[in-house]
């Protein structure tokens, strides 16, 4: 992922921290809340607005049996809705399942294949099962981390310059860092970042010529939303 992409990612993180800080000030002054905390047997459901930032790296592009040098693609970022639900097996440890409305990836030819324009499009999204560790609260703030495994699924594959476009579903590791703020009455403000790096196979045809390659994708999912403890 390029440095410019990391600068783009940093902005939503700063915005999320600002929102959490503003919520803290408002709630402390206007809405006294008892600490929600977590207990064994609790469920926490979260609904989020999420921004997907993608870094990508194309492997050797095989065209008709030969490698085409200096070929690359860009995918682009997208905004979507996500949902996850966690079950607390203890006051600090939870099992979390995460899904979302699929994001749209638009593969654009770059460098030696830039003249192809839009290569293909596909909807995609991970289904992630994670084990989370929730730290003890700091005032009303509840930080947490998670690690797990996700299945990256691809839907609605659309041809562009590349015909018979296909991209394979893949398993991938998943990492998460998050922070919740207790608003009271079982409601919490949620902010988290997930990272799901994976490499997958892409095939298709360019006219009558078969094309194949591998693409490494490094998506960050930045989310901001509400959580409910029950």
UniProtKB/Swiss-Prot annotation:
The gene is alkL. It comes from Ectopseudomonas oleovorans (Pseudomonas oleovorans). This is Outer membrane protein AlkL. Could be involved in the transport of substrates. Belongs to the OmpW/AlkL family. Its main location: membrane. Residues 1-27 form the signal peptide. It is found in: Cell outer membrane. GO terms for biological process: transmembrane transport. Keywords: Cell outer membrane, Membrane, Plasmid, Signal, Transmembrane, Transmembrane beta strand.
